[in-house]
């Protein structure tokens, strides 16, 4: 896949996105067609975006062609879990040096691919371009093609060097690599009328494992997972699914749209967070598959699960009802978590709109109401001031804001991809309620908000001094 300016513009002007110029004309978000601006990669560059989209393919090797820091500084940042192979957790890099920059790194890359195949025998090798290797002009496509012919294993180039744009653009390039080199290259053993693909679900903290059993109960088969806990082979025959389900992510929208164009697979966009969204997701999948019996089974399952969930959540709702939180995260989580919080009786008084589409912002306005605050961006000082002004009880944000909250003695819950607890599906709601309860009612808050013992002693002494000057000297002598 040659990464030309035309290709970049094509992905930036995604026709399935409401920001596209054909849909909005003059109102189009200008960032869709602009060159990457300085700072656009803050919080994740295009290389990082492509990598975190594809690394969850657990039986493949992922080789970063560039300086060692490109792999080392970003490896393992997304907590995707595997139910089997662990090869995806091993970081491979060509460790480009100054000599390689001068003389080229193509031979080094070729040898690295052969060595990985010899020692680990992966199902496939994904090779990621970085800024350095793109700037010196290494022909990664040609090297991958030659190596694949030599070892008889697919070698997929992922040309998304960091300087071309943001993490979201890199996600789309990852999807393009799958479309160009993987999807449609194999056939499944059999198909059913109930085969679906999950796109944009990365199995963070094992979240997908709380949803798959529900689909199995309904007789729905997940043919391919793109890409959480995925095997390379299943992505090869993803083109035989009857429906693509986009989960809480528009970053791989290009993949869903092109699979509809190329293979006639319709797609829907859903969320696994919150009771209402989970119910809606199951209903919409059943409706799209078009089987009345499946729809009846879905309603029965929803009734059973929500009844059991209400019993499990009752003690948490009693303690969480009326609590106020500030939500500071990005993308679809800025509205999907609001829905989950409302199910627990929690009031979200403010949320961020970073990386949110216009559709996301409309959902936020509807969920928050007229009094809700929408933050475009904010630093630590502004966040703490917002918590104070809104009298919020808690900050829900990503790990980078953890110490901001803890230093201010504010309860905190990590909601981003680094977390270790699954919040999706019905079982995820129970886990989220438990985490919120434990964070809010931890005994540590009462302890750390008390004055220090020496401050208490001095306060007592000051009071005694002002009330009875004659006794203060004796008190000081006793303490000394």
From Swiss-Prot:
Task: List keywords of the entry alphabetically.
Answer: Nitrogen fixation
Keyword Transmembrane helix set for record: no
Judging by the UniProt lineage, the source's domain of life is: Bacteria
InterPro entries for the chain: Nase/OxRdtase_comp1, Nase_comp1_CS, NifE, NifE-like
Residue ranges the record marks as coiled coil: none
Q: Provide one Gene Ontology biological process annotation.
A: nitrogen fixation
Pathway assigned in UniProt: Cofactor biosynthesis; Fe-Mo cofactor biosynthesis
Q: Which Gene3D superfamilies match?
A: Nitrogenase MoFe cofactor biosynthesis protein NifE, C-terminal, Nitrogenase molybdenum iron protein domain
**PANTHER family (UniProt xref):** NITROGENASE IRON-MOLYBDENUM COFACTOR BIOSYNTHESIS PROTEIN NIFE
Query: What role does it play?
Result: This protein may play a role in the biosynthesis of the prosthetic group of nitrogenase (FeMo cofactor).
Q: What is this protein called?
A: Nitrogenase iron-molybdenum cofactor biosynthesis protein NifE
| Native species | Nostoc sp. (strain PCC 7120 / SAG 25.82 / UTEX 2576)
